[in-house]
Amino acid sequence: MNQYINLTLENIEKEHICCAIGDKKHQAGVTQKKEWIKNKIKDGHVFRKLDARGKVFVEYESIETAWVPISGSNYEYIYCLWVAGSFKGKGIANELLEYVINDSKEKAKSGVCTLVSKKKKPFLGEKKFFEHYGFKVVDTIGEYELMALQFDNHEIPRFNEQARTMKIEQQDFTVYYSYECPYVEYGVKELSNYAEENNLIINFIKIDTLEKAKNVPCIFNNWANFYKGEFISNTILNAKSFEKLMTKIKEE
């Protein structure tokens, strides 16, 4: 039987958080992520992982306090469910999701929701996996979809109106980010250095409160890219991927 661990204020310092294990360049990001989790545990934030060395975990909390531009009540929101490498194909993802569903029912929640996309994108869940458990698309912004599993007739969560704009006034390349992911800190640092070295303007907007997260002008889990006022992607960038993205944009 698989053994799992839920992170707490008592064990978080000695436990890994699955991503960026042993990768030195991301250790500052791991520290930032752990601090973020510590501050969210009081909100009922759950980080449950396999008791093993690997990327195998699920992370969720109440939609009311989740750092996403989604309005709703009495639902749990899944930030991330990830099973990677040799742990795939062993039913672990099923066990993690079933834990979320059962935990939500025990808390008398009205359902569970999560962000996916019509076509697979980095750092988002797989739509077909959630469909297998009865999740249905309840709201859409472009390629991005909000899926929900309903337990009763309570009002379903929706994207906030601000998120539907997918536009900003700023024309320079702009990144919205939060430390919900341990890969973010290094991306911000490397992009910032790249911009300085190449005399480029890249704006960084830190999302560090619930209010800011609920009012971002796009879909958002931990990173969003804008250029010439338009939303481009939710992909976390480094210098190399930024260059590749800008080349692609200029060729279009």
Over which residues does each language-model region extend?
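Conserved beta-hairpin
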Residues: 42-59, 225-230
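Conserved catalytic-core motifs of GNAT/GCN5-like acyltransferases
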Residues: 115, 131-148, 232
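Non-catalytic, surface beta->alpha helical segment in thiol-disulfide oxidoreductase systems
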Residues: 228-252
